[in-house]
């Protein structure tokens, strides 16, 4: 039986050799494609040079029950209490590979069945995924569109890809191996061009009835949730048990020309990796299925990476959190003995991976002021459990003029080696419930020639904190130029480190905002806090009709601020 199965798998791909690379041609099987695709990857691992795996047009079904199960702790995902295991159910596992391209030529679809991780790139070099569509047969963000609303009821049509069951008057959303009720909700309004968080129409209902198959009536003891006919409720649970893709401890990875129709149960996460290129990506709802939601949370999370992280020519719409979030991680020093310290992951959703290696440069920072008190080089590092890392310090150097405490216990540490240079260009952000971009890295950041439409929070947020999300760190060189901000909430750009203000110094430095256009029906606000060196010049503020709009600035605890000629 095994021999017959192997023969059947081999029949679905062929191998040819070109001048530049070996080519493995793969055809979509009738059933699950997991074995076929991973057999091609095993073939690629034996090649002596570059390999291109070409996927023939069609749908490649990836089912959770046939998936490869591997243990991965991933930044900003489910905690130990939210989800007991870190097992990921993986469709394609790229492990210890070099110089491999997977090319769908724009006509191959990876279709997941069940909550799972479509692909993982782990400990690889020079990997390229291109020309693919990624979707789910059972999206874990069910949807229903409002037909009618009365004072105390809603009549809604369930999307064709959303399955449900009513038990004892309660609605349960269902998929392959998953179900939930109540949950978190957003409301997509095609008339307003918004996709905003709201109260769950399921959680508030006292009764749910099936009027006809796929048509539900929700009854409420008080007022029905605000909505209008034609608007769509998007609902989800909050457990980030899987991701839409993982780049782990890899170098030179490119995602190009990929259409994400659904990303669950979190976005694509890159962690402890270098040189990441994300280009020509489309995260946009599939009109063919009348769906309106693409993301379960963030689209792209970049955590503790290095080298150049580049986003270019992407289109982002219908997320359930930030499209792009780039940050490091602060760990808290809980024990110190001589030159050995224990650093602990503090946020419940980020832990379980070793974030330090020999030779890395680490900053020691006061969590209240977010100002560094010193630096050291890692002599050795090992995890004693999934929360705690034992680090040997070499050559601690105090920051000149800093108040170094008698004990470093209670301070926070950031790995300065694993902080990327960032470029985000020529991209479009719309139908977002939160921010467009959140970025914190000390290396240069360029955000240029993008368009942000109706972000209900800051279109661009530069934060840094050591007591809530523990997402680091301070920026030192940021350029925001040539962008268009259309009807975004205030402050449109927010520099907002979560520090206790101190006369000791400023958290962020050298932020330049030039040649941008702000379009708004109300005065435009820019928020600046704890920055040394902020320049805002050559920008334009307009009303929707094109007349001049007022520019307002909320500036506190900052120095060397230049507000040049803006119009």
Task: List each model region and its residues.
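Bacterial N-terminal signal peptides
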Residues: 7-16
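Acidic Gly/Asp/Thr-rich repetitive segments characteristic of extracellular carbohydrate-active
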Residues: 25-54
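Extracellular beta-strand-rich solenoid/capping regions of secreted or surface-exposed proteins
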Residues: 42-43, 61-101, 111-130, 138-155, ...
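Solenoid scaffold repeats with emphasis on beta-solenoid/beta-helix
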Residues: 51-53, 60, 92, 100, ...
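Short glycine/acidic-rich loop motifs that flank beta-strands on beta-rich extracellular proteins
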Residues: 64, 112-118, 138-142, 242-244, ...
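Ser/Thr/Gly-rich low-complexity blocks that favor extended beta-strand/coil architectures
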Residues: 136-138, 159-211, 351-386
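Small/polar beta-strand repeat architecture
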Residues: 195-241, 375, 382-422, 430
């Amino acid at each position: 039986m095994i021999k017959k199965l192997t023969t059947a798998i081999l029949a679905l791909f062929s191998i040819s050799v070109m001048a530049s690379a070996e080519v493995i041609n793969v055809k979509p099987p009738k059933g699950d494609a997991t074995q076929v695709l991973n057999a091609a990857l095993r073939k690629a691992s034996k090649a002596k040079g570059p390999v291109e795996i070409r996927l023939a047009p069609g749908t490649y079904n990836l089912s959770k029950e046939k998936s490869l199960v591997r243990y991965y702790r991933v930044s900003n995902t489910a905690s130990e209490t939210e989800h007991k295991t870190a097992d990921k159910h993986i469709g394609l596992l790229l492990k210890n590979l070099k110089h491999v391209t997977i090319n769908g030529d724009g006509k191959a679809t990876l279709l997941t069945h069940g909550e799972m991780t479509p692909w993982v790139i782990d400990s690889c070099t020079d990997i390229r995924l291109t020309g693919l569509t990624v979707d789910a047969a059972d999206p874990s963000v069910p949807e229903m569109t409002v037909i009618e609303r009365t004072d105390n009821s809603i009549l809604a049509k369930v999307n064709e890809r959303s399955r449900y069951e009513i038990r004892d008057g309660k609605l349960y959303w269902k998929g392959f191996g998953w179900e939930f009720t109540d949950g978190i909700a957003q409301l997509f309004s095609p008339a307003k061009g918004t996709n905003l968080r709201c109260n769950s129409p399921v959680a508030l209902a006292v009764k749910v009835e099936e009027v006809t198959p796929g048509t539900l009536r929700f009854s409420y003891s008080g007022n029905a949730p605000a909505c209008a006919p034609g608007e769509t409720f998007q609902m989800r649970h909050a457990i980030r048990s899987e991701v839409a893709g993982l780049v782990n401890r890899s170098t030179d990875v490119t995602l190009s020309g990929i259409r994400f129709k659904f990303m669950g149960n979190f976005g694509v996460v890159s962690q402890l990796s270098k040189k990441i290129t994300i280009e020509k990506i489309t995260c946009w709802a599939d009109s063919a299925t009348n769906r309106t939601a693409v993301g379960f949370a963030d689209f792209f999370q970049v955590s503790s990476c290095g080298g150049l992280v580049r986003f270019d020519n992407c289109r982002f719409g219908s997320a359930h959190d930030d499209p792009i979030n780039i940050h490091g991680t602060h760990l808290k020093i809980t024990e110190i003995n001589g030159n050995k310290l224990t650093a602990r992951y503090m946020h419940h959703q980020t832990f379980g991976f070793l974030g330090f290696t020999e030779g890395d440069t680490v900053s020691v920072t006061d969590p209240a002021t977010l100002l560094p008190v010193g630096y050291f080089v890692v002599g050795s590092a090992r995890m004693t459990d999934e929360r705690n890392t034992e680090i040997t310090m070499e050559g601690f150097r105090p920051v000149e003029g800093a108040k170094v405490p008698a004990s470093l216990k209670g301070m926070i540490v950031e790995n300065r080696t694993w902080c990327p240079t960032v470029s985000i260009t020529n991209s479009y952000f719309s139908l977002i419930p939160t921010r467009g971009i959140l970025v914190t890295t000390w290396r240069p950041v360029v955000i240029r020639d993008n368009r942000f439409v109706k972000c209900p929070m800051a279109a661009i947020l530069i934060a840094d904190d050591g007591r809530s999300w523990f997402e680091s760190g301070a920026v030192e060189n940021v350029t925001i130029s040539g962008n268009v901000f259309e009807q975004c909430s205030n402050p449109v750009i927010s520099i907002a480190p979560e520090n206790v203000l101190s006369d000791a110094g400023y958290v962020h430095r050298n932020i330049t905002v030039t040649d941008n256009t702000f379009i708004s029906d109300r005065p435009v606000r820019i928020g600046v806090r704890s920055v040394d060196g902020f320049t805002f010049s050559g920008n334009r503020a307009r009303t929707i009709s094109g007349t001049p709009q007022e520019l307002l600035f909320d500036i506190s605890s900052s120095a060397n601020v230049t507000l040049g000629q803006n119009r």
